[in-house]
A protein has these predicted regions:
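Hydrophobic core segments of alpha-helical transmembrane domains in multi-pass membrane transport
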Residues: 10-21, 31-39, 71-80, 118-125, ...
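Re-entrant/interfacial helical elements at transmembrane boundaries that shape
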Residues: 91-94, 131-143, 172-186, 412-423, ...
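Membrane-embedded alpha-helical segments and adjacent helix-loop junctions characteristic
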Residues: 46-155, 335-428
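Long, contiguous bundles of hydrophobic transmembrane helices that form the permeation core
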Residues: 193, 207-308, 320-343, 462, ...
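Alpha-helical transmembrane segments of multi-pass membrane proteins
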Residues: 107-125, 149-174, 188-206, 227-230, ...
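Membrane-core helix-loop-helix motifs of multi-pass transport proteins
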Residues: 143-237, 253-265, 456-488, 493-496
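Alpha-helical transmembrane segments and their helix-start/interface "positive-inside/aromatic belt" motifs
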Residues: 9-29, 115-118, 152-160, 164-167, ...
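Hydrophobic transmembrane alpha-helices of multi-pass solute/ion transporters
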Residues: 1-77, 90, 94, 98, ...
Length: 496
């Protein structure tokens, strides 16, 4: 394996710096990819550029990448369907009726209730982080707009309740991946090991708790405070010059004529998508369950299969199932005809082209950093030689944060850090569960803060907000949770 040293840090850091500084995220990511391949090709501009083009093409060699990008595009069709059907208008009317009751008792409580409902929804859909952020965005964006709550706030709530709940309630693909990594380190019962470490996974716990505190407190900080002030005083849901992750054609679709708004036209397709997620996870992991747990009960095999299933396949089939169901459901109600459905599907997909492009660039820069420049491995190797037992969890957390921030992938960070953290903790006699939790929490923290994270990108898309504005407004809250988690790891590490 070729070692690039500190040069491996430049592509992700420069790409992220320019993305935040210039708000030109597409150009910044493309430049980061090009710089990475320039380093690999010894700064030969011709071969570096050709390798960059090939790297973008190679994104689609990975079936998981392709399925994820297809999922993002098809989400546009689902969004436009539920708006055209009157489902969004019906949901707004239904929630408004509930809020009216509370508004009569205490003025202003409706804003709090809607935000708490959004947080709770994201928390409960722990089976898959992508489905979680999509559901929260699709359900609550219209209500946030109506109540004058910024889309940046919605993106923050969706993002901060998705990955943290998915990793803390690990009966999903997250848990399966973590158990696979732990099993590779020689743990005889990786499930029990994972559960014991969850009590020490402080970042996702704190990140989840900060959200309701911020909502109930009613005060925001940093860029989020400015965003909320903008909406309140100027009535602008987006900042001037903002570039929402989805086209206005999707968020401003008018309801079909002569249609009565019905909340179930929105709720049922969303529930179909959420329901199909664990079903498809179990289906794609069933063969492995029969192989690994042949004597277990059907229920135990089902739970194990969910953990072994393909997340990208599950989300793609889930959204396809929801779209196909919606077509039949709306046709039976005479809301729209087949020709209009096809036109709306194509219109919805076209509205997601910016998101699909951004996902492609994010996958490409993640690949060049992880698999070619080995950025994460370099960062981990820099600190592992001078660790003391008490500092192991603290520094493992910080390194995990940096790797995830630089590569935009929490799972990739887990794959790098667990094989390093476990032997290190065993060799230095550090708390093994605390160290595992630190590696996992660092991955989630960096993933939250990074503009090249797929979860952050999907949160921006689902909330129809500018991606860089989402990253900027979420960062102070993530830093608070991350700082608190780091301090706890340091104190516990030094006391044990």
């Amino acid at each position: 394996m070729h070692e690039y040293g500190y040069l491996s840090l430049l592509p992700p850091l420069i790409a992220i710096f320019f993305a935040i500084r210039t708000k030109q995220v597409f150009v910044s990511l493309l430049f980061g990819i090009w710089l990475g391949w320039m380093i690999i090709e010894n700064f030969n501009p011709l071969t570096g550029t050709l390798s960059t083009v090939q790297a973008l093409v190679d994104v689609y060699k990975d079936p998981g990448n392709t399925r994820t990008i297809m999922f993002c595009a098809l989400v546009g069709a689902l969004i436009i369907f539920i708006q055209r059907s009157g489902g969004v208008a019906g949901f707004i009317h239904w929630v408004s009726g509930i809020l009216h009751h509370y508004e009569q008792r205490k003025s202003g409580s409706n804003r709090i209730i809607v935000q708490l409902l959004a947080w709770l929804t994201g928390l409960l859909i722990f089976v898959e982080s992508s489905i979680s952020v999509l559901t929260v965005g699709a359900l609550y964006r219209p209500m946030f707009d109506k109540l004058g709550i910024s889309r940046e706030k919605l993106a923050y709530i969706a993002d901060s309740s998705s990955a943290p709940s998915s990793i803390l309630i690990p009966f999903n693909g997250w848990g399966a991946f973590i158990m696979t990594l732990l099993a590779a380190q020689g743990f005889s019962d990786p499930f029990a090991t994972m559960l014991k470490s969850m009590a020490y996974n402080f970042y996702p716990i704190i990140a989840l708790l900060i959200v309701p505190v911020v909502i109930l407190w009613g005060k925001d900080i940093g860029p989020m405070a400015k965003a909320e002030k903008r909406v309140k005083e100027e009535g602008k849901l987006l900042a001037d010059g903002a570039q929402p992750m989805i086209s206005d054609e999707l968020t401003e679709v008018e309801m079909a004529p002569n249609v009565t708004p019905k909340a179930y036209n929105m709720a049922i397709p969303i529930l179909i998508m959420v329901f199909m997620m664990p079903i498809m996870l179990a289906y794609t992991g069933w063969g492995e369950a029969l192989k690994e747990r042949p004597d277990a009960s059907v229920f135990d095999q089902f739970i194990f299969a969910i953990g072994q299933g393909s997340g990208s396949t599950a989300v793609l089939i889930a959204v396809l199932s929801s779209i196909l169901f919606s077509m039949v459901f709306y046709r039976v109600q005479n809301i729209m005809g087949f020709k209009e459905m096809i036109e709306l599907t194509l219109k919805g997909i076209s509205g997601m082209i910016p998101l699909a492009l951004l996902m492609m660039l994010a996958f490409a820069i993640g690949d060049v950093c992880k698999n070619h420049l080995h950025t994460g491995t370099y960062v981990a190797s820099v600190v592992q030689d001078w660790l003391s037992p008490g500092l192991v969890p603290f520094l493992i957390f910080l390194v995990g944060c940096f790797i995830a921030f630089s590569t935009g992938t929490s799972w990739g960070t887990f794959g790098i850090m667990i094989p390093i953290a476990v032997p290190m903790a065993e060799q230095l006699d550090a708390n093994i569960y605390l160290t595992i939790a630190a590696a996992l929490g660092g991955g989630v923290f960096g993933d939250h803060c990074s503009p090249i994270s797929d979860t952050s990108i999907l949160s921006s898309m689902a909330s129809a907000t500018d991606h860089i504005e989402h990253v900027r407004t979420q960062l102070p809250y993530a830093l608070m949770a991350g700082g608190a988690a780091a301090l706890i790891y340091l104190l516990i590490g030094l006391m044990t």
